[in-house]
From Swiss-Prot:
Residues forming the catalytic site: H88
GO CC, one annotated term: riboflavin synthase complex
Name used for this protein in its record: 6,7-dimethyl-8-ribityllumazine synthase
One MF annotation (Gene Ontology) recorded for this entry: 6,7-dimethyl-8-ribityllumazine synthase activity
Class of the enzyme per the UniProt entry, highest EC level: transferase
Entries under Gene3D superfamilies matching the protein: Lumazine/riboflavin synthase
Swiss-Prot/TrEMBL keywords: Riboflavin biosynthesis, Transferase
InterPro entries per the UniProt record, alphabetical: LS, LS/RS, LS/RS_sf
Pathway assigned in UniProt: Cofactor biosynthesis; riboflavin biosynthesis; riboflavin from 2-hydroxy-3-oxobutyl phosphate and 5-amino-6-(D-ribitylamino)uracil: step 1/2
Chain sites annotated for binding (2S)-2-hydroxy-3-oxobutyl phosphate: E85, T86, R127
Gene: ribH
Family, as annotated: Belongs to the DMRL synthase family.
Catalysed reaction, written as an equation: (2S)-2-hydroxy-3-oxobutyl phosphate + 5-amino-6-(D-ribitylamino)uracil = 6,7-dimethyl-8-(1-D-ribityl)lumazine + phosphate + 2 H2O + H(+)
The species this protein was found in: Thermoanaerobacter pseudethanolicus (strain ATCC 33223 / 39E)
Length: 154
């Protein structure tokens, strides 16, 4: 029996990160977490490229451009969508998650969903580096594992 499992080795891999500027005080923490994870696992600064977009809704377009370029072993999407008083949250959260999943399937480049979708600002703060860990760190670890797994299954 052959078992495939991605390793947590970022050395020699290239990573693209798309970060939403909206809710930047949260997304900066997610980015810090992602960079920490990548570097802890062996990625070099020159192997990481970051693209800032205005909001979460714009993440899929730039993530798609990055994935289609084939310059990256994985792309990490980071953002924070926080529920307000209108249905806007539902539209943005749904479209971003669907868009990111579609890009991975269409390009066969792992595009990792590191977009927080929370009911409150407090929930976002917790998930961006306090008690709930850092979802940016977790997204980067997933990217490393998936990049290695994709290489192994070729």
């Amino acid at each position: 029996m052959k078992i495939y499992e991605g390793k947590l080795i970022a050395e020699g891999k290239k990573f693209g990160i798309v970060v939403s500027r909206f809710n930047e005080f949260i997304t900066n923490k997610l980015l810090e977490g992602a960079l920490d994870a990548l570097k802890r696992h062996g990625a070099l600064n020159e192997d990481i490229e970051i693209a800032w977009v205005p909001g979460a809704f714009e993440i899929p377009l730039i993530a798609k451009k990055m994935a289609e370029s084939k310059r990256y072993d994985a792309v990490i999407a980071l953002g924070a969508v926080i529920r307000g008083e209108t249905p806007h949250f539902d539209y943005v959260a749904n479209e971003v998650s669907k868009g990111i999943a579609k890009i991975s399937l269409d390009t066969e480049v792992p595009v990792i969903f590191g977009v927080l979708t929370t009911d409150t600002i407090e929930q976002a703060i917790v998930r961006a580096g306090t008690k709930g860990g850092n979802k940016g760190f977790e997204a980067a670890v997933t990217a490393i594992e998936m990049a290695n797994l994709m290489e192994e299954i070729k």
